[in-house]
Structures are given as structure tokens and as C-alpha cells.
């Protein structure tokens, strides 16, 4: 799994404007290899807002195919970069470990297995 983040520095008080743009179903949800999307607002920033859009993909090629698709062009072509976006940075992460919650019984079994 690959995670792609797009972190945007936003003029103070305008972070919600960018967040709202992602609060609807878009074309990315129909792309092969797309696993999910989260939009994060960084807390306690003093001089600016910071919004990070996190997308999860099966592979980096799946993400690249999205950026080369007509769906991507359609989703981005009619939009100029809003004045409130000061800068942004895209980062790629390869997921190496994924852990989920355990029930109490599972946690007990896991502890016993590790002790052996």
C-alpha cells in the first residue's frame, strides 16, 4: 500500500474552504487501486492553517494512473489555485506495517504466543 499526502499551507481562517472542496464524492473514488481518502486539519497553527489530504493506493502506479487520467484532468482543469493556498507539498509513503485493534481475548492470545 502507498500513501500520498498533499499538505497545503493556507491563509489563517481559510482551511475550511479547502476542506469543503473534498467533502463530496469525486472521480477519484472510482479509480482502480484507490483505497481511501482523509482530509486532516493541523491543530494549533498560529499564523496559517494547514490542511493535509491523504490518499491511500494499492500501488504508486495506481496513483500515477490517476494523475494521468481524464478523470483527474476533469476534476482539476476548471480550477485555478485559490488565493488562500500559500504553498503545498506532495509526499509519498510506502506502508511497511499495518496494525489494527484487538479484542481483549485476541490480545491475551497474542501475549501468550509472544511468550512462547
From Swiss-Prot:
Cellular localization per UniProt: Cytoplasm
Binding site for heme: 76
Gene Ontology CC terms: cytoplasm
InterPro entries: ABM_dom (IPR007138), Dimeric_a/b-barrel (IPR011008), Heme-degrading_MO (IPR050404), IsdG (IPR023953)
Domain of life: Bacteria
EC number: 1.14.14.18
GO term, biological process aspect, one: heme catabolic process
GO molecular function per UniProt: heme binding; heme oxygenase (decyclizing) activity; iron ion binding
Site residues (Transition state stabilizer), renumbered to this chain: 66
Ligand binding (Fe cation): 6
The UniProt record lists the keyword tRNA processing: no
Key words of the record: Cytoplasm, Heme, Iron, Metal-binding, Monooxygenase, Oxidoreductase
Domain ABM: 2-92
Catalytic activity: heme b + 3 reduced [NADPH--hemoprotein reductase] + 3 O2 = biliverdin IXalpha + CO + Fe(2+) + 3 oxidized [NADPH--hemoprotein reductase] + 3 H2O + H(+)
Cited HAMAP family: Heme_degrading_monooxygenase
Function: Allows bacterial pathogens to use the host heme as an iron source. Catalyzes the oxidative degradation of the heme macrocyclic porphyrin ring to the biliverdin in the presence of a suitable electron donor such as ascorbate or NADPH--cytochrome P450 reductase, with subsequent release of free iron.
Family: Belongs to the antibiotic biosynthesis monooxygenase family. Heme-degrading monooxygenase IsdG subfamily.
Subunit structure of this chain's protein: Homodimer.
Protein's name according to its UniProt entry: Heme-degrading monooxygenase
Top-level taxonomy: Bacteria, Bacillati, Bacillota, Bacilli, Bacillales
